[in-house]
Regions:
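Charge-rich, low-complexity N-terminal segments
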Residues: 1-133
Length: 133
């Protein structure tokens, strides 16, 4: 399996409702380093996994709607607990749609799976990984 990973970052604010979250129940900020890995069994006709420029630009566009936002006020997340894991899936869905829609290039349809990792710090990260349906 071949893979290429691109990286960006976002800064958000949110609160996590529920006793399980302890002090994170209050409004707080987070800076995430966001990695998106693209996997495919065989290279495309240009001998690449994905166009890195398009992948980087698309990730930047996906993250733009979240960057510097208070997720408690974000319409797409009303009623949701915006955990790191939840945000991984949200970004995954947006990136998978970009693959399916051809925004990552004419041969991106050969991408088999994606993994979206949100690095909270040097000691904690979460990810969502799945096949592209």
């Amino acid at each position: 399996m071949y893979a290429v990973e691109v990286r960006d970052h976002i800064m958000i604010a949110h609160s996590l409702k529920g006793a399980v979250f302890g002090p994170a129940q209050g409004l707080h900020g987070a800076t995430y380093v966001v990695d998106v890995a693209f996997f495919r069994a065989e290279l495309d006709p240009d001998n690449i996994v994905v166009d890195i420029g398009r992948a980087t630009d698309t990730l930047k566009q996906v993250l733009h709607a979240l960057n510097y936002a208070n997720l408690d006020d974000h319409l797409a997340f009303m009623g949701q607990v915006t955990t790191t894991e939840f945000l991984c899936r949200h970004i995954f869905d947006q990136m998978a749609a970009a693959v399916r829609d051809g925004r990552l290039g004419p041969h991106a349809g050969g991408i088999d799976r994606l993994r979206v990792t949100l690095n909270e710090s040097h000691i904690a990260k979460a990810w969502y990984e799945a096949a592209i349906a």
